[in-house]
């Protein structure tokens, strides 16, 4: 039996679930799609002759971004022991959200550019060397910018139900 004095967990809070599902994920999807399109010239796929292949890659990456962004937010909420939205430590949630997203992206970029050679950067991609591995700066910046902005927009557009 749950202690009535204990704070409500975020996963039991309808407002928190609505914020995640109806606000955060749509904002994250829209912003991720925009980022993926804008950073296309930074990858060699930009020169691929088949526009359908490029469109599929953008869609595939956007769906992946949304899943990573959702997992990162859930990890942040669990790590910070978040309660209802009003109880969230937004700074801590955002820091963990960024850390998980950047960490996974660094691993994914390394795996896909070095180990699997699934994709390559164009000469336009700014890179950063971390522990001897050259990583694209754009995908790392994406996780510093996009999920926090999506969460901020979600919170900003979230309206509490009026008490009658």
Residue ranges of each PLM-predicted region?
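Aromatic-rich, lipid-facing transmembrane alpha helices and their immediate juxtamembrane interface loops
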Residues: 1-164
């Amino acid at each position: 039996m749950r202690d009535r004095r204990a704070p409500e967990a975020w996963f039991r809070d309808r407002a928190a679930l609505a914020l995640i599902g109806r606000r955060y994920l749509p904002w994250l999807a829209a912003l991720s799609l925009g980022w993926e399109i804008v950073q296309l010239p930074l990858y060699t796929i930009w020169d691929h002759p088949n526009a359908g292949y490029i469109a599929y890659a953008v869609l595939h990456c956007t769906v992946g971004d949304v899943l990573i962004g959702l997992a990162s937010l859930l990890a942040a909420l669990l790590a910070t022991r978040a309660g209802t939205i009003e109880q969230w430590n937004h700074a801590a949630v955002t820091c963990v959200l960024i850390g998980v997203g950047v960490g996974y992206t660094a691993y994914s970029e390394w795996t896909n550019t070095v180990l699997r050679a699934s994709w390559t950067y164009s000469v336009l991609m700014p890179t950063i060397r971390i522990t001897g591995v050259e990583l694209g700066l754009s995908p790392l910046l994406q996780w510093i910018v996009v999920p926090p902005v999506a969460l901020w927009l979600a919170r900003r557009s979230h309206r509490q139900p009026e008490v009658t």
